[in-house]
Amino acid sequence: MEKRPEDTRVVVGMSGGVDSSVAALLLKEQGYDVIGIFMKNWDDTDENGFCTATEDYEDVIRVCNQIGIPYYAVNFEKQYWEKVFQYFLDEYKAGRTPNPDVMCNKEIKFKAFLDHALSLGADYLATGHYARVDRSAGTVRMLRGLDENKDQTYFLNQLNQEQLSKVMFPIGDLQKSRVREIAKEAELATAAKKDSTGICFIGERNFKTFLSQYLPAQPGDMMTMDGEVKGRHDGLMYYTIGQRHGLGIGGSGEPWFAVGKDLEKNILYVDQGFHNPLLYSDKITATNVSWTRPGLMDGGEMTCTAKFRYRQEDHKVTVKMTGDDEAEVIFDGQVRAVTPGQAVVFYDGEECLGGGTIDDVYKDGTKLWYV
């Protein structure tokens, strides 16, 4: 039998934003024994000595005092550097475009932080993610958040059954607008705070400037597949497949896009047209493939839908396992700007089945020059 809410301890991962604030408020109102914990993953003191983490923690303290729950801060900077940031740099070095949010959820929020919560006697860890868990069928299923525009299952695709069984997403069945309303009605300190955007450790800083502090940039030629030089690039790591902005190629006709990379020769390939054939593919290989519940791939093959980037529409695919955590994903048609390093995430209707990392990209049986 399930424990009563008042006998159930829930640790809420609080970021200082409105979503996690409302998650904590709702759980408290439902009678749970709630503890708010702020995670510090990155020392983001800027040149002027200003640290957004300090400001965020102050917001967490204000909200927890308003709700009437205890709060703590916990530091995971070392784990974050080793598991997330190092991975981020390694992927860029390899010419790929990583997704640090996926790795942060897998290694920090729902591993290191979850373990910490359980060590405090917590029954569950709750976060302000827009996703849902369905416990009705014996196994736990992860479902998309009801607010389609805010659904965050894409970033949670690596969570396994063990993690999902200990997780709560209190705002997953709410629209973002309703979350703001609840915060305003309760007069929470974060009710009007704007949402954070971009990669957490870069914040509002310029991406190129930030990355160049850690990886030396190697400028090189920008050219067409026919070998016509169109200019210079600042370093392959700054460009992603399908990118239009920042190429600096003038002239008439359709806009120019990054369509390929040659890491050995340090060449960025460019061509014109949003629907340029060079931007389309029909198959990928994926690594680090994991599933949200056991038995999904017992047959070794499955037809489902997939997303290749956040907020993209779903595409019909066939997934074939080629190793323990490796798969071949064949598209039903062609998809634009599928990018190595990004997440491929699998769905069956509302359910998120799991996902992996896009490795090689193919078209008509030929591997594309995407890294």
Swiss-Prot record:
GO cellular component labels: cytoplasm
Residues at which ATP binds: G13, M14, S15, G16, G17, V18, D19, S20, M39, G128
InterPro entries: MnmA-like, MnmA-like_C, MnmA-like_central, MnmA-like_central_sf, Rossmann-like_a/b/a_fold
Subcellular localization, as worded in the UniProt entry: Cytoplasm
Annotated positions for site Interaction with tRNA: H129, Q342
Pfam families: tRNA_Me_trans, tRNA_Me_trans_C, tRNA_Me_trans_M
EC number(s) recorded for this UniProt protein: 2.8.1.13
Catalytic activity: S-sulfanyl-L-cysteinyl-[protein] + uridine(34) in tRNA + AH2 + ATP = 2-thiouridine(34) in tRNA + L-cysteinyl-[protein] + A + AMP + diphosphate + H(+)
Keyword annotations of the record: ATP-binding, Cytoplasm, Disulfide bond, Nucleotide-binding, RNA-binding, Transferase, tRNA processing, tRNA-binding
Region span, Interaction with tRNA: 150-152, 309-310
One GO term of the biological process aspect: tRNA wobble position uridine thiolation
Gene Ontology MF annotations: ATP binding; tRNA binding; tRNA-uridine 2-sulfurtransferase activity
Disulfide linkage: C104-C200
Active site per UniProt: C104 (nucleophile), C200 (cysteine persulfide intermediate)
Interaction with target base in tRNA: annotated segments: 99-101
Function as written in the Swiss-Prot or TrEMBL entry: Catalyzes the 2-thiolation of uridine at the wobble position (U34) of tRNA, leading to the formation of s(2)U34.
Family to which the UniProt record says this protein belongs: Belongs to the MnmA/TRMU family.
Protein name, entry field: tRNA-specific 2-thiouridylase MnmA
